[in-house]
Amino acid sequence: MFEVGEKYPVESSSSSNDIESRGVQPITSLKDNKSIGMIEKDNDDLSCEQYSTCDEVKRDLKARHVSMIAIGGTIGTGLFISTGSLLHTTGPVMSLISFLFVTTLAYSVTQSLGEMTTYIPVSGSFAQFITRWVSKSCGAANGWLYWFSWAITFALELSVVGQVIQYWTDAVPLAGWISIFFVLLTTFNLFPVKYYGEVEFWIASTKVIAIVGWLIYAFCMVCGAGKTGPVGFRYWRNGYAWGDGMIVSNNGKYAISFINGLINAVFTFQGTELVAVTAGEASPRAIRSAIKKVMFRILVFYVLCMLFIGLLVPYNDPKLTQDGGFTRNSPFLIAMENSGTKVLPHIFNAVIVTTIISAGNSNVYSGSRILYGLAQAGVAPKFFLKTNKGGVPYFAVLFTAAFGALGYLACSEDGNKAFTWLLNIIATAGLIAWGFISVSHVRFMNVLRKRGLSRDILPYKAFFMPYSAYYAIIIIFIVVLIQGFTVFWDFNASDFFTAYISVILFVVLWIGFHFFFYGFGKDSFKWENILIPLDDCDIDSGVRDINDAEFDVPEPKNVWERFWLLIA
């Protein structure tokens, strides 16, 4: 069996603590293929000028932090707000089908990440996996697009939080709320990551408790505890099961509704891959623990919520679209109001506000770490590597947060249209990232096979591999290709760019970086520069022996601790 430091010597276990104290693991520069992420133990005479990453992030996140960051980044606007748009457009049945379908994709992608990230835990890791095992230009393009999606998501969260607060009062203008949270979240992300992790843990814990409580409440209402009596599947009968869709014919309506539902659901699920982004600041075992619980969290926090929303709120409920549209009317609140509960909607709206703030916090954190990883790889300006005393890449934080200014688009008369525009860009960019995560994993497994190495060497072995990776690649390619095809029936330039701008941006970045690396000569079109040969794929740099990582898993002493061990 392959042992780290023997057949492919990269890092001996004896030096793991030295390396861990410095931050992220070594990465290969895209431009010169030199290690730029680590100062070797035997090279103490090397100066910081020779290694531009002397400023490094710190590995201060614990297992519960990592798991809750993944939850905190995903439970936000997508679940609490955009599910209303999904329900109205597609109906309860197609909404649930869309969620179940995207669940299979999210599970496949996170399992692929689990195998790669626990083996090579580096900050912003999956963009670097694409760089190592697909192509340098593809990795750079994907990394920038993925960063862009999180920067835009921050703008979307800012655009929504003020509108949710306006559920209570319009005394403060929307621009005022956007400005307040813009400054607060940007400032908070400049504090050391251990504070971020601890605050995010407790905020995300509030989300978890609130959702579990809402599910219990919803179950009681469906069974007849509310003023409407037993609801059951009332809104799944008599034409309520399917939304209006976009066209009249039934077959076409179902197909279009399903595609629209997928895009909306992908936006809701985006962030399940955040465990990989935190890899540079967490124990590898913490990553492994978080990956194992992805399916449980998805089923509880997404699928069950969508099921009960569809049971309690009819797709044509006027509250879904009145008074500002979907962004001000969460289906969670509508379900409570329809059941006759007076005070609980206000309490839960406070939870939603906290949730969106937390999600925005995670957006800036994730985007800044992705940008930091891009700078390490040599495809972003070097000043993004600068960190403060707390190990925070402050230039990366500020640049990522600056895109929050797009949140002011919500102040225009077409605020809801801007929300939909941002949502589609984010969802498509997220799908592209998911697709290349799966492509990277297929290449990773091929390299292992080429070297004669068994998957038994991996700290985490996923189920249904490699079949689920191929499944994700095929489905994602099809969805990205057809998700905007209705614009061609009655072509509109604005709708076209809304649907495909992420695809266009990715292609432009890919081509641009390809010529940046290889120029315009004959070498540019050599196959080995388009797709890295398996023999040249680097699966050695950054490898860690997971058994050497310090990680304590305390035994749960009571029911409460068992609950948190299950969740986080």
From Swiss-Prot:
GO cellular component, one term: plasma membrane
Membrane topology: Multi-pass membrane protein
Keyword check for Isomerase: no
Transmembrane domains' residue ranges: 66-86, 89-109, 145-165, 171-191, 201-221, 255-275, 294-314, 340-360, 390-410, 419-439, 469-489, 501-521
A GO MF label: amino acid transmembrane transporter activity
Keyword Ribonucleoprotein: no
GO BP term, example: amino acid transmembrane transport
Renumbered residue ranges of the record's region Disordered: 1-24
Alphabetical keyword list: Amino-acid transport, Cell membrane, Glycoprotein, Membrane, Transmembrane, Transmembrane helix, Transport
Inducing factors: Expression is negatively regulated by the transcriptional repressors NRG1 and TUP1. Expression is also regulated by SSN6. Expression is repressed by HAP43. Expression is induced by antifungal agents caspofungin and flucytosine. Finally, expression is also induced during biofilm development.
Record's function text: Probable permease for arginine and lysine.
Name under which the protein is recorded: Probable lysine/arginine permease CAN2
Protein's organism: Candida albicans (strain SC5314 / ATCC MYA-2876) (Yeast)
